Amino acid sequence: MKKKNILIIAALIVSICNAQTPKTEPYVPETPLWPKNTPNNWPIYHLVHPTFSYDSPFDPNPAFFYKGRYHLHYIYKNEAGFSFAHVSSKDMVHWKWHPTVLAPPTTGHGMFSGTGFFTKDGQPAIVYCGWSSKRNWIQYALDDDLNKWSKPQVMLPKGKDGKFIENVPYFDPDIWLNGNTYYGVNGVSSDDPPQIMKSENLKDWILIGDLLHPDFDEKKLGVKKSEDISCPNMFKLGKKWVLVCISHRLGCRYFIGDFKDEQFLPEYHALLGGNSKRYFAPESLLTPDGRRVNWTWFHGGEVQGTQSLPTELELPSDGILRIRPIKELQSLRYDKQTRKKLIVKKDTSVMLEKIKGDHLELKVVVKDTGEHNFGVDVLCDEQGREGLRINVNREKNLLEVGDEKAPLMLKKGQALTLRIFIDATLVEVFANERQIIMTDKPRGAEARINDGVALFSQGKDIKIDKIIAWKMKSAYAGD
């Protein structure tokens, strides 16, 4: 009888435990899909996340060109936690979503900021911060579509004493190949210096020390050495090395320099995207024809997960970084309109007839920029009001787009070409391939669409030598 009671009690305990333990279903990777009917305030040629996410950020992450397709990952948070969405494209314009396979159920941790790189054997690999793991991790692609990945391999360096360095906050890594040696960086979001390490096989890492060389010249560069370096991406551009990253205080920025004693010694520093902290978390890849193409996350956009246009970075022999939209975007153009030799009287605004729309590309050419302010109002009403102002501020040597601003040095009489991309509420402006500003003019999904374009001048007449406008097709009509 006692044995029978014991068995009954044991069975009851097992039953209670099973009832209190939640059932875990096998993880089925979701595939985000572009909605059939999107609200009219959604972009149609910027990459955005099309489905619900429980949280931000949406940093662009591992990017590759592999087996005829471009691949880009970005962070979002689904029911499983922080994951890497995966999109691919033949041209960096028309994207399709893959199953979200890089997620906590398959890796054992959340997926946070990192980068992509190729091994010495040409195999795509990713390095990233494992959310909640306090470690950085490496995984290797196991198929041509980048839908299958190896198990995570920890990236943990040893110090000079041969012991693993464990009690360090590991965060925002990057890996690149220089010669026959892999170098890796552990980014920081504090005053602690980012660390650089090296490996011959991606498994055995040796700490070198601080990423930034002791000869870092704060006065020359105009920035403190202690400014945080998050979302780092290091690559060779021309004959120099470039580090793009963010500072949580300053926003997106870049250094140009060289390596000395296996540490990075910058010669130049500037912000990328002006004073905007919304142009965030850069990530780049190398195209088959040798172009370096960069994306950033546009923080706080009307639609979650908005990425900047893919932007080519070039460093010619003059050492000045060139920033331009990729040529592949031209495939979306139609209904070309051209106007030449337009005179805008001082302190007036001129509406452009038949040039209007909220999905446009504009090219504005001014051969003599003079000494007075002028510019373009976009997304304005029929009277040229209530628009987003793009102001060439000659008095302060600034490019101002809405509330955002960036330095724009023009000599007296120097020519200027503005490339302006309007995509629903988004406005992205490139100036002389030297500056980029991205902002938006929010509107509700059912709100009236103001889509006018006007030219203005302040203080003196200005001659607009040429303005070309194209309407832009949707990039989501097919792959």
Briefly describe each language-model feature range.
Residues 31-33, 258-277, 283-479:
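Beta-rich accessory regions
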Residues 2-9:
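Sec-dependent signal peptide recognition
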Residues 10-18:
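Hydrophobic h-region of N-terminal signal peptides that target proteins for export
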Residues 227-235:
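Functional cores that coordinate and move charged inorganic groups
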Residues 20-224, 236-275, 296-340, 377-379, ...:
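Beta-rich carbohydrate-recognition and catalytic domains
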Residues 58, 229, 279:
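Short, well-structured alpha-helical interface segments that form or flank functional binding sites
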